[in-house]
UniProtKB/Swiss-Prot annotation:
InterPro entries: G_ENGB_dom (IPR030393), GTP-bd (IPR006073), GTP-bd_ribosome_bio_YsxC (IPR019987), P-loop_NTPase (IPR027417). It comes from Nitrobacter winogradskyi (strain ATCC 25391 / DSM 10237 / CIP 104748 / NCIMB 11846 / Nb-255). GO terms for molecular function: GTP binding; metal ion binding. This is Probable GTP-binding protein EngB. Pfam families: MMR_HSR1 (PF01926). The keyword Chaperone does not apply.
């Protein structure tokens, strides 16, 4: 389901997440962001698309990022840092598309995300998580367009793949790739994951290892 990820990259990805990752910062506003350091990789997506679960699966820590059945619980930019020597941070962004949240809160989240994307020189890529069962929705298209306009590199990750029939997944990947073809800031490869089964997690780690290696050359 992914391309160009050989055994060496898979091993680099494993090593990237072999050490202990930890929570370091929560930012409710742009003024409270941590100082820029190393590289940052952010995770965006609709409420309850599985961002926190994916971060937990990547790091091998079941409770590093707090998960909730309540949509819209993550209202801050949550930063996690790798072990000494890795010099990489993961950023769990507020979920979008939660219509029941107060309008003022939605506006605050939107402003925070927009300012973060525009002003973060250490941001290497945003992984936009899309529920594999539902595909790219209108609210996702709005976010992808904003990333294009901000010239922020991003890559789509289909989540909850275990809830889609194997016979249907190839078509869903093709549809997603076709939809992304018109987005200039989108990385062409579509990643497929399941936090519950672990499928696709080694490939996502490998993709991140390649990204980090490219930025450090």
């Amino acid at each position: 389901m992914t391309t160009g990820l050989d055994a060496e990259l898979i091993e680099q990805g494993r090593k990237l997440f072999a050490g202990e990752w930890q929570f370091i910062w929560a930012s409710p506003s742009i003024e409270t962001l941590p100082p820029m350091s190393g590289l940052e990789v952010a995770f965006a997506g609709r409420s309850n698309v599985g961002k926190s679960s994916l971060i937990n699966a990547l790091t091998g820590r079941s409770a590093l990022a707090r998960t909730s059945r309540t949509p819209g619980r993550t209202q801050e930019l949550i930063f996690f840092e790798g072990p000494k020597g890795v010099d990489v941070r993961l950023v769990d962004m507020p979920g979008y598309g939660f219509a029941s949240a107060p309008k003022a809160r939605i506006a605050s989240w939107t402003s925070l995300i927009h300012q973060f994307l525009l002003g973060r020189a250490t941001l290497a890529r945003v992984y936009v998580l899309i529920d594999a069962r539902h595909g790219i929705k209108d609210i996702d298209k709005t976010v992808l367009g904003a990333l294009d306009r901000s010239a922020v590199s991003y890559q789509v990750v289909l989540t909850k793949a275990d809830e889609v029939k194997v016979t249907e997944m190839a078509e869903r990947i093709d549809i997603t790739r076709t939809q992304l073809a018109s987005h200039p800031a989108a990385f062409p490869d579509v990643l497929v994951t399941s936090s519950r089964t672990g499928n696709g997690i080694p490939e996502l780690r490998a993709a991140m290892a390649r990204l980090i290696g490219d930025h450090r050359r």
